[in-house]
Design a protein with these regions (language model features):
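Histidine-centered active-site/metal-ligand motif
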Residues: 145-146, 332, 390, 476
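Acidic, metal-coordinating catalytic cores used for nucleic-acid/nucleotide bond scission
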Residues: 95-96, 122-125, 518
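Hydrophobic helix-and-loop "lid/oligomerization" segment in the mid-to-C-terminal part
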Residues: 2-116, 136-137, 155, 187-405, ...
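Mid-to-C-terminal polyanion-binding domains and interfaces
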Residues: 54-56, 287-291, 297-327, 379-529
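Metal-dependent catalytic neighborhoods of phosphoester/phosphodiester hydrolases
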Residues: 100-102, 128-134, 511
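Amphipathic alpha-helical transducer elements in NTP-driven molecular machines
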Residues: 127, 173-176, 180, 218-222, ...
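Active-site cavity-forming subdomains of large catalytic enzyme subunits
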Residues: 107-172, 180-188, 197, 214
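Active-site glycine-centered loops adjacent to acidic/histidine catalytic or metal-binding residues
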Residues: 63-65, 144, 512
Length: 529
């Protein structure tokens, strides 16, 4: 029996029928959509199968982030398993040619006799590089999820990008999700079963790319997390070794976001993403331990760099703005995206963090849940040398002389998107309840709603309650939230208590989320009136 309050929340979110609600709460692999609904799928599979049959050399080319690393590893290992022996991979290098397919990588592929290039998590905007490959007689299949310019697409043989078809059922997919559908299509054609490692890597890439956790993404992440809960279920030696080195007993979405993902990302941020790919592909335990230890150490180094840069960025944030656009030529290029995310968390503004490279300004952008970042950057494209990404994240580069004008333009665009007021800071509850309503049924319903993320946010509740036993805890306060009959441990941000002069024993109207632990829960108070 589904908890009535959970059912009401889901109905407000568009799950109007019992069948919709049941499929949402109990996702299964059998609910996956037909992969051949993705335009270009049949042609892509035919081209790949023919290349394998003819023993033509295949290159998989991926991006350097978690999505690109998992996509590359996923497709490489799968194609090997179905008979591809003449296959290699290459990964973008953040510090040489940056995001996308570098011209040098294409020229090397041509020299190496590559006949088919398959891009993963990139390629939609790599017009010049793909043109070089095509002129040399190399076939190119682009698999990507980044926003395309429909009037200026690369001359690839096939482009598998769900965003080319706005009516597509797959527009929320990450790059690894597109690869997942490609593999699903090949499995269907060849009458073979999915292997568990396909789901594991697709889950990690999807979670870390911060895409909406609905529809296909919900199935991929929910089913993948069930497999990852016990490390003994992990069929990928390198991933299992990393989980062991991180001392994770029951892997959760939080572990993926804040431990596994950052380690995989650290390879591309500070060194070379191929270390992470090699880890996910190796069948040798000693090599797995060596690589997992290396990327874990890189992540520790990354954390120290981030701490200092975030503090510097916070100090530069201006009041009464709609955006954070911050520039420091000494900031490390590999951590800009993380710093941008921290700035969004700090004040809920779309944030762009910039540094200098080779005489140009380059950086990473992150959005809050209310702004389509890619659309905003399209409004500023005349000031940019290059940009690419999607609704929530993007990369940009521009000339120094255009920086101040870009700041002003981006600020104005975001202001207009917000309807000339700061609506992004308004908090809207999913449901008003009493603390008495927080019972086993509600908790079990919230567990079924997991994993939470964009498109499936942890519900915000509104209740009248008082607080007591206020104790300082890092950047927050630990408190007890209570009414006349129930008490719950809670966390409240210092900024909220300062702004509202919160006093023990007084009743307030509070907005909060219920944070689920392994054996208990607590409230995270996000606003008090």
């Amino acid at each position: 029996m589904i908890n009535k309050k959970i059912k009401k929340i889901l109905q407000h979110r568009g799950y109007t029928t019992d069948d919709d609600i049941n499929k949402f709460l109990y996702p299964k692999m059998e609910y996956l959509q037909d992969p051949y609904l993705l335009k270009g799928m049949e042609e892509a599979i035919s081209t790949i199968c023919n290349a394998i049959k003819e023993n033509n050399k295949i290159l998989i080319y991926g991006d350097y982030d978690v999505d690109g690393v998992t996509s590359t590893s996923l497709l490489f290992s799968f194609l090997q398993k179905i008979g591809a022996t003449n296959i290699t991979y290459s990964v973008a290098n953040r510090f040489n040619e940056g995001y996308g397919i570098g011209k040098k990588a294409i020229e090397k592929a041509i020299d190496d006799g590559v006949k088919l290039i398959i891009t993963v998590d990139c390629g939609t905007k790599d017009i010049d590089s793909i043109a070089i490959a095509r002129r040399a007689g190399v076939e190119v299949i682009v698999t990507d999820h980044h926003e395309p310019d429909n009037n200026n697409l690369p001359n690839a043989n096939i482009i598998l990008n769900p965003k080319l078809d706005k009516e597509s059922k797959f527009t929320e997919l990450a790059g690894c999700g597109v690869v997942f559908k490609l593999i699903q299509g090949i499995c269907t054609k060849m009458y073979i079963d999915f292997n568990e490692d396909i789901l594991l890597l697709a889950c990690i890439g999807t979670v870390c790319d911060i895409v909406p956790l609905v529809n296909e993404n919900r199935i991929i992440t929910s089913c993948g997390l069930k497999l990852l809960e016990e490390s003994s279920n992990c069929t990928i030696l390198g991933l299992k070794t990393l989980i062991e080195i991180l001392k994770l007993k029951k892997t959760t979405i939080t572990d993926i976001l804040f431990l596994i993902g950052p380690c995989i990302n650290a390879a591309g941020r500070l060194d070379d993403a191929s270390y992470a790919i090699d880890l996910l592909l190796t069948n040798e335990k000693e090599k797995a331990i060596e690589l997992a230890t290396h990327i874990k150490n890189l992540n520790e180094e990354r954390k120290m760099m981030c701490k200092n840069t975030v503090e510097e960025a916070y100090a530069m944030i201006e009041e009464n703005k709609y955006t954070n656009v911050l520039y420091n030529p000494s900031w490390h290029q590999g951590i800009l995206g993380i710093v941008a995310s921290r700035c969004v968390e700090y004040n809920n503004r779309p944030s762009i963090i910039l540094t200098e490279k080779d005489g140009f300004i380059t950086g990473s952008a992150r959005s809050n849940n209310n702004i389509d970042l890619y659309s905003a950057l399209c409004e500023c494209k005349e000031l940019l040398l290059r940009f690419g990404g999607h609704t929530m994240a993007a990369g940009i580069s521009l000339e120094k002389k255009n920086l101040e004008e870009f700041k002003l333009k981006f600020e104005e665009v975001i202001k207009q998107m917000n309807g000339d007021n700061k609506k992004q800071n308004e908090i809207k509850e999913d449901l008003e309840i009493s603390l008495d309503d927080i019972d086993d049924g509600l908790i079990e319903g919230l567990k079924l709603m997991q994993p939470f993320g964009i498109g499936n946010e942890n519900p915000i509740f509104k209740s009248k309650l008082a607080v007591s036993e206020i104790q300082e805890y890092e950047h927050n306060y630990k408190v007890i939230a209570y009414n006349s009959t129930k008490r719950f441990p809670a966390i409240i941000k210092k900024k909220i208590t300062t702004n509202n002069n919160v006093r023990e024993g007084e009743e307030y109207l509070c907005y909060y989320k219920i944070i689920l632990g392994q054996n208990n829960c607590y409230l995270s108070l996000i606003d008090i009136n």
